[in-house]
Swiss-Prot record:
Membrane topology, from the record: Multi-pass membrane protein
Pfam family, one: ER_lumen_recept
Gene Ontology CC entries for this record: cis-Golgi network; endoplasmic reticulum; endoplasmic reticulum membrane
Native source species: Drosophila melanogaster (Fruit fly)
Subcellular localization(s) per the UniProt record: Endoplasmic reticulum membrane
Topological domain spans for side Cytoplasmic: 22-35, 81-96, 138-149, 200-212
Ranges per topology, Lumenal: 1-2, 54-61, 111-117, 169-178
Keywords, ordered alphabetically: Endoplasmic reticulum, ER-Golgi transport, Membrane, Protein transport, Receptor, Transmembrane, Transmembrane helix, Transport
Keyword Transmembrane helix among record annotations: yes
Name of the protein described by the UniProt record: ER lumen protein-retaining receptor
Family statement: Belongs to the ERD2 family.
Family matches, as PROSITE patterns: ER_LUMEN_RECEPTOR_1, ER_LUMEN_RECEPTOR_2
Bilayer-crossing regions: 3-21, 36-53, 62-80, 97-110, 118-137, 150-168, 179-199
Length: 212
């Protein structure tokens, strides 16, 4: 495993920790898109169905369990334990507009037309756009709390580092995956405007605001 993938995984785990601590400490999920969290849960469920059938390494298995458990915990906290604090009115993105195209695309463009491979491909496509409801929520409310901004930055950094991981693997191993690379580019592009605002505002102690 190369340093870029490891750093990306750490950034991903850090983002999850920030999110869960934010919800638990404030006893509120205000400012967090439950729809994005549902999409991420679907991503992990469809990607890691091979958890009990395919063993790669202890590290790989631990990360799979971690992402499945934390995504489930996040959805539980938002829709059950702290349901009263969830902003239903602003979190109004139509996620079927993401789910259906990703499902259709995974049936048409995949590495192999098998159930597991199609589901894996679906998870890759869906992850690339799963953050859209969160960005839409921030845009509708007009601003994001600093802790939410840190969460989004860590999540975006994870994907950017994974792109570097693919560059490294191509240069060192002559290995590449066009589906993963394309989805990673799409996801990173979605974060670009946020990255700019994060660096120019949040790091200077100002509130992050996205254009409506």
């Amino acid at each position: 495993m190369n340093i870029f993938r490891f750093a990306g995984d750490l950034s991903h785990v850090f983002a999850i920790i920030i999110l869960l601590l934010k919800i638990w400490k404030t006893r509120s999920c205000a400012g967090i898109s439950g729809k994005s969290q549902i999409l991420f849960a679907v991503v992990y469920l469809t990607r890691y169905l091979d958890l009990f059938t395919t063993y790669v390494s202890l590290y790989n298995s631990v990360m799979k369990v971690l992402f499945l458990a934390t995504s489930g915990a996040t959805v539980y906290l938002m829709y059950v334990k702290f349901k009263a604090t969830y902003d239903h009115n602003h979190d109004s993105f139509r996620i079927e507009f993401l789910l259906v195209p990703c499902a259709l695309l995974s049936l048409v463009i995949n590495h192999e037309f098998t159930v597991m491979e199609v589901l894996w491909t679906f998870s890759i496509y869906l992850e690339s756009v799963a953050i859209l409801p969160q960005l839409f929520l921030v845009s509708r409310t007009g601003e994001a709390e600093s802790i939410t901004s840190h969460y989004l930055f860590a999540l975006g950094s994870y994907r950017a580092l994974y792109l570097l991981n693919w560059v490294y693997r191509y240069m060192v191993e002559s290995h590449y995956d066009l589906i993963a690379i394309f989805a990673g580019v799409v996801q990173t592009v979605l974060y670009c405007d946020f990255f700019y605002l994060y660096i120019t505002k949040v790091l200077k102690g100002k509130k992050l605001q996205l254009p409506a």
